[in-house]
């Protein structure tokens, strides 16, 4: 007959061995909350248009300077992620509009559950994407370019760029290599308004959405662990092929153009994207 105490000791040893393991990168110190094991998402169901419209009105009130078309597409992607179980209903939403120059504060962080704008901030793009305005985007390692689409935030760690936030891309072909590329949110000395005055733009990252060092920890702590980040640009390939916002069956160009048109009171929408 087996000794019960010996069996208990073996079971505990097995359990502890399963919990041990190195961080994803050698210099990483992972936060206590580890990312959940991936599960097959349920099929996304198109969100009711009235729900998106009401949420868009709230975001426009909180961020009147943001492009309503960008906010609408971000909300569409958020609704699709909610319907497929990718995130919880109270997940915060960060929106980056890379169609704006780096000299603009083009990052907004929303807490929709409490109807608040938490931050509007500067954010750098990758050196492979352009100078002051990002014009090229990539999902390829070594490109040093920014990726577009919907990201779900994950764990924090401390590495070469200090306190950082890992991102998992939810747009296949556009940002789903973010983790393997080490595309993370972090603070950086080159995200500094003084550089705008001296060189006409912010410094650039190797593809990461880098923030001012003074605010990076606060923003990261508010976005860590299964919140959402939507990165937008007027990029035709992304707007045609992105999947994160496609569950309603409406094209991205139509979503963006309709929101801009509604915000302008029915007048001509901004023509950066031609609706089909």
Question: What is the role of each PLM region?
Answer:
Residues 1-8:
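Bacterial N-terminal signal peptides that target proteins for export
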Residues 2, 134-276:
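Exported/periplasmic cell-wall-interacting domains
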Residues 19-22:
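N-terminal Sec signal peptide cleavage junction
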Residues 29-73:
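N-terminal low-complexity, Pro/Thr/Ser-rich intrinsically disordered segments
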Residues 73-98, 103-106, 133-139:
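N-terminal post-signal-peptidase region of extra-cytosolic proteins
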Residues 96-102, 114, 188, 232-235:
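Short, flexible beta-strand-to-coil junctions
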Residues 102-110, 115-141:
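Glycine-rich catalytic cores of cysteine/serine-nucleophile enzymes that process amide/ester linkages
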């Amino acid at each position: 007959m087996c000794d019960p105490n010996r069996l208990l000791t073996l079971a505990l040893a097995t359990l502890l061995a399963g919990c041990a393991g190195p961080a994803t990168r050698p210099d990483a110190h992972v936060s206590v909350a580890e990312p959940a094991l991936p599960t097959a998402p349920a099929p996304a169901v198109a969100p009711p248009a009235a729900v998106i419209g009401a949420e868009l009105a709230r975001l426009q009130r909180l961020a009147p300077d943001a492009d309503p078309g960008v906010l609408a597409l971000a909300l569409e992607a958020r609704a699709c992620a909610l319907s497929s179980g990718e995130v919880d209903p109270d997940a915060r939403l960060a929106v980056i509009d890379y169609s704006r120059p780096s000299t603009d504060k083009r990052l907004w962080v929303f807490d929709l559950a409490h109807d608040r704008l938490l931050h509007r901030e500067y954010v750098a793009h990758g050196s492979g994407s352009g100078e002051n305005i990002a014009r090229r985007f990539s999902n390829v390692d070594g490109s040093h370019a920014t990726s577009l689409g919907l990201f779900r935030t994950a764990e924090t760690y401390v590495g070469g760029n200090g306190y950082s936030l890992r991102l998992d891309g939810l747009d296949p072909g556009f940002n789903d290599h973010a983790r393997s590329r080490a595309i993370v949110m972090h603070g950086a000395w080159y995200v500094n308004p003084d550089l705008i005055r001296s060189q006409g733009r912010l410094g650039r990252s190797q593809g990461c959405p880098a923030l001012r060092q003074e605010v990076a920890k606060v923003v990261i702590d508010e976005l860590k662990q299964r919140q959402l980040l939507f990165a937008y640009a007027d990029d035709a390939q992304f707007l045609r092929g992105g999947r994160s916002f496609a569950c309603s069956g409406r094209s991205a160009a139509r979503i963006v153009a309709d929101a801009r048109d509604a915000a302008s009171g029915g007048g001509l929408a901004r023509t950066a994207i031609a609706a089909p």
